[in-house]
Amino acid sequence: MAARLLLRSLRVLSARSATLPPPSARCSHSGAEARLETPSAKKLTDIGIRRIFSSEHDIFRESVRKFFQEEVIPYHEEWEKAGEVSRELWEKAGKQGLLGINIAEKHGGIGGDLLSTAVTWEEQAYSNCTGPGFSLHSDIVMPYIANYGTKEQIEQFIPQMTAGKCIGAIAMTEPGAGSDLQGVRTNAKRSGSDWILNGSKVFITNGWLSDLVIVVAVTNREARSPAHGISLFLVENGMKGFIKGKKLHKMGMKAQDTAELFFEDVRLPASALLGEENKGFYYLMQELPQERLLIADLAISACEFMFEETRNYVRQRKAFGKTVAHIQTVQHKLAELKTNICVTRAFVDSCLQLHETKRLDSASASMAKYWASELQNTVAYQCVQLHGGWGYMWEYPIAKAYVDARVQPIYGGTNEIMKELIARQIVSDS
């Protein structure tokens, strides 16, 4: 019953958004109940703040927060040791309506709006539990199928992915090709009407548990540029020649399964091609801004979590006969952190609004990802410092947040690549 009510509220929200004025108008205080922005909120993680959200989003946020408190946080330490979350969690998330939120209902998704999706990103960050790969599955993998897949592909995979019964991954990165997607060596060659796939991928999130992987492969080495010869393929777990390597032992995100994948003469039917042949690079460029916005929102939400965790600590910890929070240097550091967090939150929220109306460009998404992920690492460093020796202990949440933050400037395109993309727009004549 709870899940059905949740789905209904999301559908109502989606229907309302079609008749509402544009986001810029909805953000004005005139004629609407004023909502606090993060600088004025009692806590940066409070429910009911930020003008981009509505009361329906607040109701949804409460249910998502409860889900993470009851179904994720109590088991996360166990999953960190296992190097993966349970498949049961995925199906629970599906029943709760937390997967495929922004995928159209006609395709088998929930049919909610982008801001509802953002709620799930933020609440996972507030839980300090990086294990569940829900956002990659729902908001990176599923859109490729929904946007470029055939009717048969959509009907076969989207409903199962929304239910958490089919876990998705995307395989771009290779041992010799990370941010340089044009350096991909994994290839697919025609064999009659089929394709023969060979190659390897590394650092694949959800790779170990995955039931379906979108694989980036070269299909035309004679193309005028590598970008013109890349295609996407849907590879299912269990296909002959598809081998999952070991789970990789990472510095952080220890409960998030990350694997190597190998493809040895995997025979794929023609129906495994996703979209048009040799158009894969363009599909990737089209979808990457959402991935970078996702990383930015996760990053600033993690900053908000770390700030509140640290504020609570320094208000309780005593030194020199008073709480650490009453030491002026600590107060100044907290003031700096909160100011930077609130400024970045305002920018990320503006990017969420732009993306909700399909107006977020690559450079803006790159700015958000670059700035927010750098700030996340700065905040993590300073918050550990404010915890003193206890911040170095794994039992303290800030220690885990510190190591989890380090990958944010690396994946989704390194921050050095983000600067290249931003600079390209600056100097472009068009």
UniProtKB/Swiss-Prot annotation:
Its cofactor is FAD. Pathway: Lipid metabolism; mitochondrial fatty acid beta-oxidation. Inhibited by crotonyl-CoA, 2-octenoyl-CoA and 2-hexadecenoyl-CoA. One of its GO terms (biological process) is fatty acid beta-oxidation using acyl-CoA dehydrogenase. It is found in: Mitochondrion matrix. The keyword Kinase does not apply. Homotetramer. This is Long-chain specific acyl-CoA dehydrogenase, mitochondrial. It comes from Rattus norvegicus (Rat). The lineage of its organism: Eukaryota, Metazoa, Chordata, Craniata, Vertebrata.
